[in-house]
């Protein structure tokens, strides 16, 4: 009798789990109609006589124009925050479906504002960056990045502690399959002032936007505002 009851419990639990999976997968609306997984994109080897650095990943090149990226410092036992960002030049060689050479013509040349991202992680050898595309007059400018929808603000995450480079990539993509929105993500190679920084994750910054979190845009004239928890 006990074995029969145990079998019914297992059977019922399995059915409930299957129902919940189907409900979340088919009935919960997704903000992204079709999520593109970077590892599933077919790669085409770009035939070229160019020499030098070559990769099957998108290449992001940043020129700080001899400026030092601001970093929070400790003076007299107190943390002092430097200015938030610096104005830089950015080049994107970022088709996710073919290989790239560092010496090839970039798809996009644009101005940008960059700063370090994170608290304790900004002291790692491999630092994460927050990037905002702007015009020559430092006004917000939206660009596609590695096939992801147009936006101005992006995160270049340097997975310093995760030597597999898989943890955040898998987490974002699994979340994107079951949630209404999770940031899109692409692998990329990062160069700063011509020096190779390693493999990074280009990630959508979590913010209000048609292609990001679809909430009402805040009005500075009103006291109430939408927010993201």
Across the structure, where does each feature detected by a protein language model lie?
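Phosphate/dinucleotide-binding and metal-coordinating scaffold of catalytic cores
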Residues: 2-229
